[in-house]
Structures are given as structure tokens and as C-alpha cells.
Amino acid sequence: AWAKHFNLIKYFNKDLDISEFKPLKQNNGTSFKYNFDKFENTNNTIEVFGWACFDNINAKDSKIEILLINENEPLKAIKFLTQKVNRPDVTIGNKSNVDLSNSGFSSTYNKEKLPKGNYKIAVFVENKINNKKGLILTDKLIKIE
């Protein structure tokens, strides 16, 4: 099982073209809700745990990505390694009539090889079945010196 895990990481595409959202604003595309339950920026690692979902759309088919956006290259985003987390509390907390339990995520990023610069943390959610896509720039800023 471990070998499979490492193969997935080996072929992980770290960049995401977000030029469709230019000019980049705080809220881009379809609006959605999100929350960071945990955000830690340590010496080498950024960890983010939380949830994100579109209103009134089952989260089962939504893909969630946590991104780093360099202020000098705002149309190219660096993806975190993001895994889905089951969060039945999100459906209850939002008093939703649709299942939002697949809206949870856990993300980590090793920032040792990041070029110097200022990076904003962004949340990207896409649901191809419902043709919805959105990107939100958060208030989280990472400075690499």
C-alpha cells in the first residue's frame, strides 16, 4: 500500500492554471462557503484542515484544492497535496438539505523549495457535474525570504 501512495505523490501535478479568473479578485467564479479549522505555518510546512462547499449542491462530486498564489505570478497557482475528509458536521452546521459531508479537506505543503516571495493562500472548489467552479483568496499570507 505504501508503494502506491508514493507513486501518486511522484506524479502529482503541483501547478494549476487559474488564468480563467483574471483579473484575480478576492471572490472568483461561483461563490462558496469555506472554513479553516486549523491553519499552521511552521518552519518547513504549511498545514490546513477545514471544509469548503457550494450552497445546495451535494459535496460528493466536488474537488477541493488549497493553493499558494505568488503575488508576482498571480495566474499560476501551486497546489497543496489535498485529501478529502468526511465531515458530517458541515451538513448539520449549515442546516443543509443536501449532503455536505464530503466537503472536508486536509492539506499539507512542504515550503522548503518555494522561491522567495509573498504568497496568498486560496481555496479552489470545482464540481464538474453541476458546472460550478470558484476560487477565493483568503486573508492568509506566507512570506518566503
What does each of the following model-derived ranges do?
Residues 2-145:
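Basic, ligand-binding patches in group-transfer machinery
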